[in-house]
């Protein structure tokens, strides 16, 4: 199979998993939001330890993950990891609080707005985006208006929580972008 086909199939798989996650989150509303975020974080952390050890093994075992000197992580890697983790925790917690009172589809749409919020953040960082990006931002704002705003031009509190989640997820992408070349 060609690399482009594999890449496309992997993107489709990731999108499907992401979409099903909202249904699972909605089903888990009986679990307190902070508890759910903590459990998700622990599961992800344990999985990442496994992935790190696997990649280390595939690369010849050059990186010492656990040694007497520490974890083999630089100061900047610690800062980047902690900052990304804190921002991600805030975003998922707001999302979980928001999904309690709104449906999964609406939560997914509002959360996905982070994609068009990132270029808006980019303006403040001196980054320019092409015209088609701004057209997409406009279309997304119109979609948000029709989906979430009432005739009195108000937003449900749960939708506001999910919108805050999208703003924080966009910040997460911005933080990752900041550290990607360094780490």
Please place each PLM-identified region on the residue numbering.
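Glycine-/small-residue-enriched transmembrane alpha-helix faces in small-molecule transporters
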Residues: 1-35, 39, 85-86, 90, ...
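Small-residue-rich packing faces within the transmembrane alpha-helices of Major Facilitator Superfamily
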Residues: 19, 42-46, 117, 141, ...
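Specific transmembrane alpha-helical segments of multi-pass solute transporters/efflux pumps
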Residues: 21-22, 53-111, 144-146
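Hydrophobic/aromatic residues within transmembrane alpha-helices
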Residues: 28, 36, 40, 98, ...
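C-terminal transmembrane-helix exit sites in multi-pass transporters
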Residues: 47-52, 114-135
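Hydrophobic transmembrane alpha-helices of multi-pass small-molecule transport proteins
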Residues: 48, 129-149, 161, 165-169
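Structural signal for membrane-spanning alpha-helices in multi-pass inner-membrane proteins
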Residues: 48-55, 95, 119-122, 144-148, ...
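Membrane-interface helix caps and helix-loop-helix hairpins in membrane proteins
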Residues: 96-102, 127, 148-157
């Amino acid at each position: 199979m060609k690399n482009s086909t594999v890449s496309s199939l992997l993107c489709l798989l990731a999108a499907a998993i992401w979409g099903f996650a909202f249904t699972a989150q909605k089903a888990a509303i009986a679990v307190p939001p902070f508890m759910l975020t903590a459990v998700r974080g622990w599961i992800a952390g344990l999985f990442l330890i496994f992935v790190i050890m696997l990649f280390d093994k595939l690369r010849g075992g050059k990186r010492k993950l656990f040694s007497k000197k520490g974890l083999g992580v630089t100061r900047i890697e610690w800062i980047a990891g902690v900052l990304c983790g804190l921002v991600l925790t805030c975003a998922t917690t707001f999302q979980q609080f928001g999904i309690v009172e709104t449906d999964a589809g609406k939560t997914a749409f509002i959360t996905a707005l982070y994609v068009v919020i990132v270029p808006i953040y980019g303006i403040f960082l001196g980054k320019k985006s092409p015209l088609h990006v701004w057209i997409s931002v406009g279309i997304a704002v119109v979609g948000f208006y029709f989906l979430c705003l009432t005739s009195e031009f108000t937003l449900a509190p749960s939708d506001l929580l999910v919108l805050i989640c999208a703003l924080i997820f966009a910040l997460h992408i911005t933080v990752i972008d900041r550290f990607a070349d360094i780490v």
